[in-house]
């Protein structure tokens, strides 16, 4: 069975950038409506056809594992500045069978994921939007090398 490291921007309590991940995933429309809160949120809609009718969506939450998916969470430096005050970059280890994704977005089953570590976003010092994403990429690479042997 293959596994992956999945990242999520969330509070220390596990609350993400969406008001209601479950409500979005259970949307009856072809695309999720993406009910935003006052906080920034991933702009791309996740196609519901990625789930079959038997999938229990109640345990699935949004995350990312690629640079392209990460850019849907942070659109500009102002988003990052807001997020860095209250949010952490959480790292989860998840078996591939509990991950559903397309090129722009990812959801994973939080009940089947193992929290590896949380990094305060305020400790990441970017100098511009592309630097933020590049720093994430560097963190991803470092974490992957140092943590996969411990999982």
Where are these regions (language model features)?
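Conserved NAD+-utilizing ADP-ribose enzyme module
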Residues: 1-45, 55-59, 68-151
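Conserved aromatic
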Residues: 64-65
């Amino acid at each position: 069975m293959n596994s992956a490291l999945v990242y999520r921007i969330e509070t220390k309590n596990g609350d993400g950038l969406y008001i209601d991940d479950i409500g979005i995933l259970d949307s009856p429309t072809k695309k999720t409506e993406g009910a935003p809160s006052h906080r920034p949120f991933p702009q791309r809609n996740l196609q519901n056809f990625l789930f079959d009718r038997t999938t229990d969506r109640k345990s699935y939450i949004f995350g990312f594992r690629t640079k392209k998916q990460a850019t849907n969470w942070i659109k500009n430096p102002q988003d990052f500045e807001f997020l860095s005050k209250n949010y952490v970059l959480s790292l989860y280890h998840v078996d591939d069978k509990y991950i559903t994704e397309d090129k722009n977005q990812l959801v994973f089953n939080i009940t089947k994921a193992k929290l590896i570590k949380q990094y305060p976003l305020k400790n990441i010092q970017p100098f511009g939007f592309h630097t933020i994403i590049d720093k994430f990429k560097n963190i991803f690479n470092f974490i992957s090398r140092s943590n996969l042997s411990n999982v």
